[in-house]
């Protein structure tokens, strides 16, 4: 059974990955950073920042150790393949159609080994950001506009240990394990979603003085659903019967039900909101007082000692108007591994209903330390706010990362190290220039270690810098350097 379910969600994940916040925590990230905290767009170095197209992508699992570079090599999906997405979303779980659309081979050709468990998980999410921009109206107000196509997919708590014992016939080596019949109730669920998204963002500065800056922001998002697909194993119990005379003819009885649901064309819509704030602690000797055209005093752009950001993203819902659902009772005997899951998935839908799903609501906490002018250390936590067992909620994976970086106007470099809730550790590298950013937070670990997770981020943009703000910042840096120089000189004289 799992041998049929697992490939579907792996192939879905191969072309629908997850957001990665590593590259969007620096001070030159521009409009892309609005995905994780809408307050980031204010107090920017940009007058206008235009995203042409970008993608943040990640897939992973707690089950298979895979060869990610072989997957990338085989994927037939380029910037001109506009029909590929349509083919995938219309495949309705058909493995042949998915393979044809993606250009991928069989799952086994990408797997090095499997780590079996009674609670295996697979996950993948993605945001493809289309034409988007931010506009810094003045020192205190900024607005943003985003367009995106997003994907979300996961399979949770599948008993791959039982899969290994029976379908791979490893019970031939240790049949006494199966004689205990201690499998309990087999549970598991999976879901995948895709949708269009348009967002409007606003950010402001309610507090600013010589040593503190507070930024707040909000994004309102309007969604249009493309496709949803899900399955649920309902109280599926198992009983193994060992044939002592002929071990290969041992059998497994399954009893319970499998529910499958798939959306079709209809008025699929949704709404979402992101909220966030950013607090900067600045060296009060650095900002230089200025006056705007109305005579109001403000503090010029200056380095901070540390910055604390907090936000909640994807607080909302996605409504599908035409969801066809079928629940199949399962009462079968699996002998000689002759069992076709397609008999229970995707045939004879019996019920049509409306269904609302909660978006993958996530809390983000970010602390950024300024070590010395261009050098920073960033710590970030992404925490999924719903229970993994919540039935009608999209899911994402909680993650913790530490990222040292070098940052300047025209180039930034990142060395992220992160670990997620499943204990998967990864490290990578990223690079940002004025018009291009590219990287992967797992590329280093994938080169030197076996991989259960792979990601990349890439994008093209048009930055239009605010020359006045850049000059203010550089002037503050020079003042900081001079003050440090005088301080060091005075220390030497005292000694």
Predicted ranges, named:
Residues 4-14:
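Sec-dependent N-terminal signal peptides
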Residues 19-495:
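Subset of outer-membrane beta-barrel
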């Amino acid at each position: 059974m799992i041998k049929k379910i697992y490939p579907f969600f792996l192939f879905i994940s191969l072309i629908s990955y997850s957001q990665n916040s590593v590259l969007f925590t620096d001070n030159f990230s521009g409009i892309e950073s609005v995905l994780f905290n809408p307050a980031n767009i204010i107090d920017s170095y940009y007058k206008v920042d235009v995203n042409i197209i970008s993608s943040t992508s990640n897939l992973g699992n707690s089950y298979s150790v895979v060869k990610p570079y072989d997957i990338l090599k085989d994927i037939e999906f380029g910037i001109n393949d506009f029909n590929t997405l349509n083919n995938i979303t219309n495949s309705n779980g058909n493995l042949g159609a998915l393979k044809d659309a993606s250009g991928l081979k069989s799952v086994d050709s990408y797997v090095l080994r499997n780590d079996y468990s009674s609670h295996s998980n697979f996950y993948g999410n993605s945001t493809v950001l289309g034409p988007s921009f931010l506009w810094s109206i003045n020192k205190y107000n900024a607005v943003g506009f985003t367009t995106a196509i997003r994907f979300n997919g996961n399979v949770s708590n599948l008993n791959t240990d039982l899969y290994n014992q029976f379908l791979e016939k490893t019970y031939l080596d240790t049949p006494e394990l199966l004689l205990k019949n201690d499998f309990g109730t087999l549970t598991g669920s999976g879901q995948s979603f895709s949708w269009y998204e348009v967002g409007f963002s606003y950010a402001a500065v309610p507090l600013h003085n010589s040593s503190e800056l507070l930024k707040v922001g909000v994004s309102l998002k309007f969604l249009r659903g493309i496709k949803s697909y899900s399955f649920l194993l309902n109280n599926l119990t198992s009983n193994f019967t060992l044939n002592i005379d002929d071990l290969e003819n041992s059998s497994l009885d399954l009893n319970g039900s499998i529910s499958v649901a798939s959306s079709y064309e209809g008025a699929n819509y949704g709404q979402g909101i992101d909220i966030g704030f950013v607090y900067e602690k600045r060296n009060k000797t650095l900002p230089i007082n200025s006056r705007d055209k109305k005579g109001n005093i403000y503090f010029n752009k200056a380095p901070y000692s540390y910055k604390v950001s907090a936000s909640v993203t994807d607080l909302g819902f996605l409504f599908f108007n035409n969801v066809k659902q079928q629940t199949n009772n399962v009462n079968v005997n699996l002998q000689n591994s002759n069992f076709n899951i397609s008999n229970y998935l995707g045939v004879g839908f019996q019920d049509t209903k409306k269904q609302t799903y909660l978006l993958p609501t996530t809390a983000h906490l970010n602390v950024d330390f300024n070590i010395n002018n261009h050098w920073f250390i960033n710590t970030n936590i992404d925490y999924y706010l719903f229970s993994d067992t919540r039935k009608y909620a999209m899911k994402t994976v909680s993650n913790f990362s530490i990222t040292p970086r070098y940052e300047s106007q025209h180039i930034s470099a990142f060395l992220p190290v992160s670990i997620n809730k499943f204990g998967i550790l990864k490290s990578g590298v990223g690079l940002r220039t004025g018009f291009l950013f590219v990287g992967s937070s797992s590329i280093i670990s994938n080169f030197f270690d076996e991989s259960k997770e792979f990601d990349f981020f890439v994008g093209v943009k048009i930055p239009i810098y605010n020359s006045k703000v850049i000059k203010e910042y550089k002037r503050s840096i020079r003042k900081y350097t001079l003050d440090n120089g005088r301080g060091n000189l005075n220390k030497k004289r005292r000694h």
